[in-house]
UniProtKB/Swiss-Prot annotation:
SMART domains: TBC (SM00164). PROSITE patterns: TBC_RABGAP (PS50086). Residues 191-205 have a biased composition (Basic and acidic residues). The gene is OCA5. Residues 100-459 form the Rab-GAP TBC domain. Residues 1-25, 132-168, 503-514, 559-581, 645-657 have a biased composition (Low complexity). This is Oxidant-induced cell-cycle arrest protein 5. Residues 635-644 have a biased composition (Basic residues). The keyword Cytoplasm applies. It is found in: Cytoplasm. InterPro entries: Rab-GAP-TBC_dom, Rab-GAP_TBC_sf. Belongs to the OCA5 family. Residues 1-66, 132-205, 352-376, 502-521, 554-582, 634-669 are annotated as: Disordered. One of its GO terms (cellular component) is cytoplasm.
Length: 716
């Protein structure tokens, strides 16, 4: 543990400020005998520059080679700015799940998305089994102690004395003895209260020490080459804010989940995108960042300076958001952190637990038979899990099942290497970090940020709302811009027939009628005289019918309805003589976000398959526990080959493809910086870079449809 000051007291007034990574003053050399590499070394790190100094464009310590590759459609970016300025959570959620939030806007968008997220409005976290056992045993002990005593005692003042007065045989001596007894009871109650308070303080102090130790591990990861290191004033303040946020969450939700290092890692990963100190641009650097002075913090605008400089007035807009915003979002780090944990750790309430709470009087034999029946009907669970989600145990089982089905070669190799045969702190904990904690700690911050965008933007369609309601909520977004967002990533078969269902609004009743007609005519479900219906076809129909809502809209109406001048000009220039255009579709989420995360994880494994089959058991676990990112540029030695690939891709790509499109030359960008559809963060020497994590998410949708189709075939 990091050393603490000997003179520090445990008073409540000083604990809030001293609750930091170390009680040593800022810029003091801190040494950790357990965590640091060489405690006896006298190596002193170079002095850390004042982090509050504005970063100069020409004097930045971040080289171009360390900047993440990032491309983003300009029309979608402007639409995101419009929704952000108006706090339109409907539009921001749509962009987040379809294309991701621009990283430079996440610090303002994420709080808005979290405030309206369904898992924050109706939270449920799977309780820890140990805490459930403790609460059950405590209740049983309290009930046994109360029933075992023949004379129930009341702790209310004067209760025993009042009982003596009611008794006609009471005398003065009895009253004196009763008063003494009452005083003894009060003293005993005070002692019990003090004992409980001390025990609670000891528990909280232990939790706080664990938080400090986990924060120290993060520092040691970044400053591994130094046995002694300095913590600047700003770094000290950030770590203190993180510690207090984690501690307050643990105190609030401690009866449901106990403290785990994952809570600290969620806070650390959030602080890589959301500045903990209000009105500052300083975030944690993350494990990929390479800095000459090895500072813990960085200005989050530095990574995307190339992108920012390609858009006029964007830097001034971002600086206003950082330093002067009082309207869009002023939520604190602690509140954002609590809501983020509720989303990442959310799970649906188990059916067995709901039945148990509803029918507490049912006998134990019936409950056991229901549990055995649920365990035997895994086929039914496969048809409900994609929509409802499940516990972490169910998701792990589902992941292994899908891995064997979709990536059999890698699954066989994992079986041979015994990768998925045992779980524990030192075994296959990587899978728990992937699925339960949503990539916390083990994924790259750039990949994790995009996936968290997807999860925070997850929204279901309200079947009681029609197209006009949502189209109005989106501020009548331009059709061309809406088309760039594309369909839901996890769309399923049968959407084509739904797209041309008619000119009227598609509501829930119309969907149900269309589904019935299609089922009876055999267009979607071919019964072929068989009375037995396909459960997976039912799942497909249910997902397809509520996947999106659409409406045929005239070109003139769409072109004039948008509030963005740039998108209006584009729509008017592309209008044709026809009065009607194809359907305007608004995609909605249908697959549970944690189930979608399973297919994203499978897609990540598939992309690393060639590497994994060359590694042994230990190397695989280590690799998957610190999954490298492809968001950074290739090495300079590959730049020549990459240029040739970029030019070839540029010749074959179309101007309407935002994904994988090669940017144009730098000189043209400097003359007409806003004429491009896609703005890139790449430097001049390395122009083309595939958006790795976007391709991973798209491939996850393909794996989802492949799994669904294979299950439908087997179900027949």
């Amino acid at each position: 543990m990091l050393q603490t000051s000997k003179g520090s007291n445990s008073s409540s007034t000083s604990s809030s400020r001293s609750a930091s990574i170390s009680t040593a003053t800022p810029n003091t050399i801190v040494e950790d005998e357990e965590l640091l590499c060489d405690p006896k070394s006298e190596l002193t790190p170079p002095a850390v520059a004042n982090p509050l100094r504005p970063v100069s464009k020409s004097n930045t310590s971040v080289e171009d080679d360390s900047k993440p590759s990032f491309t983003y459609d300009l029309d979608v970016f402007n639409l995101c700015k419009e929704y952000l300025n108006t706090r339109n959570h409907h539009g921001l959620a749509l962009i987040a799940r379809q294309k991701g939030i621009p990283p430079i806007l996440r610090f303002k968008v994420w709080p808005i998305l979290l405030k309206s997220h369904p898992f924050v409005i109706s939270p449920f976290i799977q309780p820890d089994s140990e805490l459930l056992n403790e609460s059950t045993s405590s209740r049983s002990n309290s009930s046994s102690s109360s029933t075992g005593s023949n004379t129930p005692l009341s702790t209310a003042p004067g209760s025993i004395k009042d009982a003596a007065i009611i008794d006609g045989d009471a005398n003065d001596n009895d009253n004196d003895s009763n008063s003494n007894s009452n005083d003894d009871d009060n003293d005993r109650d005070d002692n019990d209260a003090n004992t409980k308070e001390k025990e609670e303080d000891e528990r909280n102090n232990k939790i706080r020490e664990k938080i400090k130790r986990d924060l120290a591990k993060y520092i040691q990861r970044l400053k591994y080459s130094q046995s002694k290191y300095t913590v600047s004033e700003t770094e000290h303040e950030i770590l203190s804010i993180l510690e207090n946020a984690i501690m307050k969450f643990t105190l609030k939700w401690g009866k449901i989940i106990k403290y785990d290092s994952s809570l600290t890692w969620i806070a650390l990963n959030l602080a890589e995108w959301f500045p903990p100190i209000p009105k500052t641009p300083w975030v944690l650097v993350g494990k990929e960042y390479s800095s000459s002075h090895q500072s813990l913090i960085v200005n989050f605008l530095d990574d995307y300076s190339n992108y920012i400089d390609n858009i006029p007035d964007l830097r001034e807009y971002l600086e206003r958001l950082i330093y002067h915003d009082e309207k869009i979002s002023t939520i604190s780090f602690r509140e954002v952190y609590e809501r983020l944990v509720l989303v990442l750790l959310h799970c649906p309430q188990p059916v067995s637990r709901r039945k148990k709470s509803d029918n507490q009087g049912s006998n134990q034999r019936r409950n056991q038979s229901e549990v055995q029946k649920d365990q035997q009907s895994f086929k039914v669970n496969k048809t409900t899990l994609p929509k409802t989600g499940g516990t972490i145990e169910e998701r792990v089982s589902y992941f292994i099942y899908c891995l064997r089905k979709l990536i059999p070669e890698l699954s066989q190799y994992f079986h041979e290497e015994q990768i998925l045969t045992k779980f524990g702190c030192l075994d296959d904990e990587w899978l728990i970090w992937w699925l339960k904690f949503c990539g916390t700690k083990v994924w790259s911050k750039y990949d994790r940020g995009r996936i968290w965008d997807f999860m925070l933007g997850w929204r279901l369609k309200n079947p009681k709302r029609d197209f006009n309601y949502y189209y109005e909520k989106l501020n009548y977004v331009n059709r061309n811009t809406l088309e760039k967002l594309g369909p839901d990533i996890f769309w399923s078969v049968g959407n084509e027939e739904e797209d041309i269902s008619g000119d009227n609004n598609v509501d829930a009743n119309a969907n149900e009628i269309n589904n019935t007609e299609k089922t009876e005519t055999g267009k979607l479900v071919k019964r072929e005289g068989d009375i037995k219906r396909s459960s997976f076809k039912d799942l497909v129909n249910e997902l397809s019918n509520e996947l999106h809502i659409s409406k045929r809209v005239s070109t003139d109406e769409v072109a004039t309805s948008t509030s963005s001048p740039a998108t209006t000009k584009m729509a008017s220039s592309s209008s044709t003589s026809s009065t009607l255009t194809p359907n305007v579709s608004i995609p909605f989420s249908r697959v549970d976000p944690h189930v979608a995360l399973i297919f994203i994880s499978l897609s990540l494994l598939k992309s690393k398959e060639n590497i994994l089959v060359e590694l042994d058991q230990h190397e695989i676990r280590q690799f998957l526990s610190r999954l490298p990112s492809k968001s950074y540029k290739y090495n300079q030695k590959r730049s020549t080959r990459q240029k040739r690939t970029s030019y070839a891709s540029n010749a074959s790509s179309t101007s309407n493809s935002p994904m994988g499109q090669s940017p144009v030359d730098r000189d043209e960008d400097s003359i007409f910086p806003t004429s491009r559809i896609v703005i890139s963060n790449d430097s001049k020497d390395q122009k083309h870079k595939v958006n790795f994590i976007d391709n991973i998410i798209s491939e996850a949708g393909e794996l989802w449809r492949k799994w669904l189709w294979s299950e439908m075939v087997e179900d027949n």
